[in-house]
Amino acid sequence: MTVFRSSETASSSDSLREALRLAASALKAHGPPFALAGSYALWVHGGPEPVHDVDFAVAESDVDAATATLETAGFTITRPPEDWLFKAGLDSVFVDVLHAINDVPVDAELIRSGESHEVLAIRMHVLSPTLVLTQKLCALHEHSCDFAKLLPAVRAVRERVDWEQVRANTATNDFAVAFFALTDRLGITSAPK
């Protein structure tokens, strides 16, 4: 089956992949330890390919080392007002380097929790779909609650997720609970008995 994509999307995907490859290669060679996170982690596990940015996680204590490594590799470093990440720019694309997720500092244990996968010919830790979806659902709130963006990824990785764990870890977020009501009705997930 032939899939047609606009040249803009193909170009964006190529640029994101190149940024992912270059950042991972630099971090793997010069440290600090890292893990692929966010939508690209879901992509490794079978989700749709992201079109906006690449997410890596580094321990909060390793931010300066990660900044130095990526800057030396040719990335332009910017620090947005959010105090839980920095951005490493390469041409027109960004690698978001997260050192806290949902107000929880990233630590070495989280990085090590990722399974080792070969991603674009580079072996790296990749966060599990259970963890990534937990993080994405915990981040939902009244100003950021686009279920349509989550549904394709959830549908694609549903057999690789410990849904009981995700439900337990997101039970205090009303938007996550509402998301599960939708996915249960759509047959993507099953309500606990």
Language-model features and meaning:
Residues M1-K193:
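Compositionally biased terminal segments of proteins
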